[in-house]
Amino acid sequence: MKTKFNFIPEFVKKELRKTDAYKSRAIHNKTAVKYSEVEVILNEAPVLRLEKDLKMKPLVAIVKTQESIVGGDYINPKASWLRYERFCKNNAIPYGFLDITKSDWMKESEMYDLIICHTESNPAYQEMIESKIYILEYYMGKACFPSYHEIWQYENKNRSNYLYDYYGLPKIPTYVTHNRDEALELIEKVGYPFITKTTIGSSSIGVKKINTPREAYSLINNVFSFKGVSTQYPYQRQKNYFYIQQFIDDATFDLRIMLVGNMAFGYYRYPNKGDFRASGAGNTEKKDIPKEALRLAIEVRGKLNSRQMGVDLLYSKKNNNYYIIETSLFNQIDTPEQLVINGVPGYYDISDLDNIKFKEGKFWIQELVLRDVILEWYEKSKR
């Protein structure tokens, strides 16, 4: 349903969200609750405080995404802006809402010190938000989360792969080429089966396993044709680029590690029977994460210079190594328990890499990053 919904123009989606049929389905899927129920959900995590008395406080602009509004008195309880708003309220941070989709977005932004949003993952929204954050940050001098650097690498596997290559990070052998002749050479170099991906796509959307030369040649011919290949988004086609990744046949799970400041969270993900894709399968397990994997994720986040990052890792028993599958600025957060060990929710304190410790607690990751962004703004404002 989610994939099909991406095919629909935004103005049509907006009207559909108002219908009883859409609302009923959303309620059934727990992606819509009454506004009166939101506070109960948010209070699953204790109030997060700044832990510092700020002499100056920023005026924060919170960007709402249209996909969070179901219509009437219902809303998607997973919407990140609800957590941003909660943090501002609990810490007496002045805030307002910014509709960045309108033509007067620049004028409306002038009054704010800090703009924060959790972007929609479709390419149309990504292109818009990337362009506007560039103006906000580099021309208007606004503090933004995500920053232009952070949004540039989000939901773009090609760009992320360039950064892995530049920093020499241990990724699954992956190649991105815009050259048809080289694409034909790469399929022989990597061997079968191999994984191919579209540059934009989450929850394993756009990820395919290619098993035979016939499939590979057909895909390459189509990708480098005049029209390219259709993707999950009807207005965007895969054209003149080929993303090929070695298939690691002895991997039985992957790890998602999420990092904010000096805190790390994470869990194991498993594919459905008969499938190779763990992302989007919904099969997760929360338990202790190996320190080797944590340190690799920390290194990746540091090199990619992102204040919040999810790092997906795969473990090969044969090679006794963890490899980067991909990274993401935003991950879906359904619960304030993103790490649980022996039934106890908490996080890893990674302030000392030689002494990583598990500490108890429940947190909304969105609140943690907003806290860090506000403190960062405060320190810069004192200079």
Task: For every predicted segment, state its role.
Residues E120-N122, I200-G201, F330:
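Short glycine-rich anion-binding loops that position phosphate/pyrophosphate groups of nucleotides
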